[in-house]
Each structure stands twice: as structure tokens, then as C-alpha cells.
């Protein structure tokens, strides 16, 4: 009886809608689970008894899951007989490190469940219907997930998952690579590998820069069209402004043309004036005496 109690842990403060499979996902990473006795009362919270094959696995589970934040519920994990000596020792030895099997209450409260970490994996081959919550539920089988994200690009649906410690990340790489991913709409096999900041961080940035370049090119085309429309709208004004000085210039040489117009007249008059003056003087002088002389010659014989 005592040996079994040393292999069984009590898990308290569970959500009211938790399932037995989720409890197994929480504790299977610490060792083979023999039995799970889940109790979900009408009024939450729920609780469960998890029996391991080895007492050392139970100790590891207490170290890793006591104080763990599961969907906003702070789990309470201790030996099934009620002793909390191991979990108290856990708080004293694991809170400061941050890379232990789990998080203590103080550490979990300060970090929160959605804090980013450097222990990151990349998940490819996700169905298009996958959400960040679906990804988080699937990757919990490998360890403590503190962040999950799903984004879509030309290559398909990809996920990024952060674990709270290095051991969980390594375990997830071994256990969850090339495994079946399922949600309420579809399923498929996913590949899991360690996240490479140099190679993997470029793809989202490229997509973002591509969208920005589109917006910039559109903005430029609009600005060009606007500038063209403005230049076109201004062109009549420019023409009018150009015409106005043209009119002024046409008006200003107007008198010049008038002054020029009489100049040929003057030249003509000058050219004509001497000619008729000579002709008039020559023609008029003989013409006038001719009729005067003619009657004289006619009258003289009459007399």
C-alpha cells in the first residue's frame, strides 16, 4: 500500500471540462502512467489521481507540475497520501533556475502562460484549419508550452511553439515529429524541428516586406496618378497663364504692327508722293495751258 502511494500523485485545481487524455498528456513525459482516476464534480475544480510505474517518476512529476498554469488554473500536485514535503523542496530548488522540469508557483506567477522563450520549435504541415489553440493542445504532449502561434504563407500553414525549458523542447522534437495532428475539421501529419532564427525568421519578414512593398508601390502609383492629375489640372492654369502673357505680348506689338503698318504706307506715300508730284507738275502745267491755248487759237481766227 505504501509503495503504491509513493507512486501515485494527487492533482488538484483542474478545469471542470478537462479530459483524461489531457491529464495523461500532462504527466506522461515523466514516465509510464499506470492508471488515471479523474474526478470532475458538478462544481469545479476537478481533481485526479495519477499512478506511475516508478516512484521516482512520481517525484519528477511533482517537481515539474506543482504550480503549473494549465489554461488559467494553477495545478496543485503532491503525493496521494497528502505529504507536501517533496513539492516544498521543489519550490526551494527549482524556482531560481528556470530550466528545471517545471515551474514553481512564484516563477509561474511572474512569467505567465504566454511568455516567449528561447526553447522554440517550428511545426510544418499543419492543416489550413489549424488554430493556435489546436497547435498548443497538440504540442502539450511534449512538455510545457508557454506560447504558440500559427501563420499562413505561400508554403502553407506553419506553427511556432515555445517551451518553458530545454528538456521539454528536446522531448517534443523526439516524440511529436512526424505525428498525426487532429482538430475538429481535419487531420494531417506534421514535422517538428528546432527553430532556426537565421533561416526561419526570414520567411515571415519576407512576407511582411512583400506586403509593405505592395502598399508602397500602390501608394506611389496613387501619388503619381495624383501628381499627374494635379499636373493635368494645373496645365490649363499654366496654359492660361501662358496665354495671358502671350496676349500681353500680342497686344504690346499691336501698336508696333500699327506703327509698322503705316510705315509701308508712308513708304508707299513717299514713293508715290514724288512721282505724282513730278507728274502733276509736269502734266498739270502743260494740261492747263493747253485748254487755255486752244480756245485762244480758236478764237483768234474768229476775230
Swiss-Prot record:
<dbReference type="InterPro" id="IPR050374">
    <property type="entry name" value="RRT5_SRSF_SR"/>
</dbReference>
<keyword id="KW-0507">mRNA processing</keyword>
<keyword id="KW-0539">Nucleus</keyword>
<dbReference type="GO" id="GO:0003729">
    <property type="term" value="F:mRNA binding"/>
</dbReference>
<keyword id="KW-0694">RNA-binding</keyword>
<feature type="domain" description="RRM 2">
    <location>
        <begin position="119"/>
        <end position="197"/>
    </location>
</feature>
<keyword id="KW-0677">Repeat</keyword>
<dbReference type="GO" id="GO:0008380">
    <property type="term" value="P:RNA splicing"/>
</dbReference>
<feature type="compositionally biased region" description="Low complexity">
    <location>
        <begin position="246"/>
        <end position="256"/>
    </location>
</feature>
<keyword id="KW-0508">mRNA splicing</keyword>
<dbReference type="GO" id="GO:0035061">
    <property type="term" value="C:interchromatin granule"/>
</dbReference>
<dbReference type="InterPro" id="IPR000504">
    <property type="entry name" value="RRM_dom"/>
</dbReference>
<feature type="domain" description="RRM 1">
    <location>
        <begin position="7"/>
        <end position="82"/>
    </location>
</feature>
<comment type="subunit">
    <text>Component of the spliceosome. Interacts with SNRNP35, RS2Z33, SR34, CYP59, CYP63 and CYP95. The binding to CYP63 is phosphorylation-dependent. Interacts with MOS14.</text>
</comment>
<dbReference type="GO" id="GO:0005681">
    <property type="term" value="C:spliceosomal complex"/>
</dbReference>
<dbReference type="GO" id="GO:0005634">
    <property type="term" value="C:nucleus"/>
</dbReference>
<feature type="compositionally biased region" description="Gly residues">
    <location>
        <begin position="94"/>
        <end position="111"/>
    </location>
</feature>
<dbReference type="GO" id="GO:0006397">
    <property type="term" value="P:mRNA processing"/>
</dbReference>
<dbReference type="InterPro" id="IPR012677">
    <property type="entry name" value="Nucleotide-bd_a/b_plait_sf"/>
</dbReference>
<feature type="compositionally biased region" description="Basic and acidic residues">
    <location>
        <begin position="81"/>
        <end position="91"/>
    </location>
</feature>
<comment type="function">
    <text>General splicing factor. Can promote splice site selection in vitro presumably by antagonizing the effects of the A1 heterogeneous nuclear ribonucleoprotein. May have an essential function during early plant development.</text>
</comment>
<feature type="compositionally biased region" description="Low complexity">
    <location>
        <begin position="284"/>
        <end position="295"/>
    </location>
</feature>
<protein>
    <recommendedName>
        <fullName>Serine/arginine-rich-splicing factor SR34</fullName>
    </recommendedName>
</protein>
<feature type="compositionally biased region" description="Basic residues">
    <location>
        <begin position="209"/>
        <end position="245"/>
    </location>
</feature>
<dbReference type="Pfam" id="PF00076">
    <property type="entry name" value="RRM_1"/>
</dbReference>
<keyword id="KW-0747">Spliceosome</keyword>
<feature type="region of interest" description="Disordered">
    <location>
        <begin position="81"/>
        <end position="116"/>
    </location>
</feature>
<feature type="compositionally biased region" description="Basic residues">
    <location>
        <begin position="257"/>
        <end position="271"/>
    </location>
</feature>
<dbReference type="InterPro" id="IPR035979">
    <property type="entry name" value="RBD_domain_sf"/>
</dbReference>
<keyword id="KW-0597">Phosphoprotein</keyword>
<dbReference type="GO" id="GO:0016607">
    <property type="term" value="C:nuclear speck"/>
</dbReference>
<feature type="region of interest" description="Disordered">
    <location>
        <begin position="195"/>
        <end position="303"/>
    </location>
</feature>
<comment type="similarity">
    <text>Belongs to the splicing factor SR family. SR subfamily.</text>
</comment>
Amino acid at each position: 500500500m505504501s509503495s503504491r502511494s509513493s507512486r501515485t500523485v494527487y492533482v488538484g485545481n483542474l478545469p471542470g471540462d478537462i479530459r483524461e487524455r489531457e491529464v495523461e498528456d500532462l504527466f506522461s513525459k515523466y514516465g509510464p502512467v499506470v492508471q488515471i482516476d479523474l474526478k470532475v464534480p458538478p462544481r469545479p475544480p476537478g481533481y485526479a489521481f495519477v499512478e506511475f510505474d516508478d516512484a521516482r517518476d512520481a517525484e519528477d512529476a511533482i517537481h515539474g507540475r506543482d504550480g503549473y498554469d494549465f489554461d488559467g488554473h494553477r495545478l496543485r500536485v503532491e503525493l496521494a497520501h497528502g505529504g507536501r514535503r517533496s513539492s516544498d523542496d521543489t519550490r526551494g530548488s527549482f524556482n531560481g533556475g528556470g530550466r528545471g522540469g517545471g515551474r514553481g508557483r512564484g516563477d509561474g506567477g511572474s512569467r505567465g502562460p504566454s511568455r516567449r522563450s528561447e526553447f522554440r520549435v517550428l511545426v510544418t504541415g499543419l492543416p489550413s484549419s489549424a488554430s493556435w489553440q489546436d497547435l498548443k493542445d497538440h504540442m502539450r504532449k511534449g512538455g510545457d508550452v508557454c506560447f504558440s502561434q500559427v501563420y499562413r504563407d505561400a508554403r502553407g500553414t506553419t506553427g511556432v511553439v515555445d517551451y518553458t525549458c530545454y528538456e521539454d523542447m528536446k522531448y517534443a522534437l523526439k516524440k511529436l515529429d512526424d505525428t498525426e495532428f487532429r482538430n475538429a475539421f481535419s487531420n494531417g501529419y506534421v514535422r517538428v524541428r528546432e527553430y532556426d532564427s537565421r533561416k526561419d525568421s526570414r520567411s515571415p519578414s519576407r512576407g511582411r516586406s512583400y506586403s509593405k512593398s505592395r502598399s508602397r508601390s500602390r501608394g506611389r502609383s496613387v501619388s503619381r496618378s495624383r501628381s499627374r492629375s494635379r499636373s493635368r489640372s494645373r496645365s490649363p492654369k499654366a496654359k492660361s497663364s501662358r496665354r495671358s502673357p502671350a496676349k500681353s505680348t500680342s497686344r504690346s506689338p499691336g501698336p508696333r504692327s500699327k506703327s509698322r503698318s503705316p510705315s509701308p504706307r508712308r513708304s508707299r506715300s513717299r514713293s508715290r508722293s514724288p512721282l505724282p508730284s513730278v507728274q502733276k507738275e509736269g502734266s498739270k502745267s502743260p494740261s492747263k495751258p493747253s485748254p487755255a491755248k486752244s480756245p485762244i487759237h480758236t478764237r483768234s481766227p474768229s476775230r
